Curated annotation (Swiss-Prot):
It is found in: Secreted. Belongs to the conotoxin M superfamily. The modification 4-hydroxyproline is found at P4, P5, P10, P15. The cysteine framework is III (CC-C-C-CC). This is Conotoxin Reg12a. Keywords: Disulfide bond, Hydroxylation, Secreted, Toxin.
Length: 17
């Protein structure tokens, strides 16, 4: 699943971030 937008960035490994 995708990270919520506030989680995207350094440390987020989701391909949709």
């Amino acid at each position: 699943g995708c990270c919520p937008p506030q989680w995207c960035g350094p440390g987020c490994t989701s391909p949709c971030c």
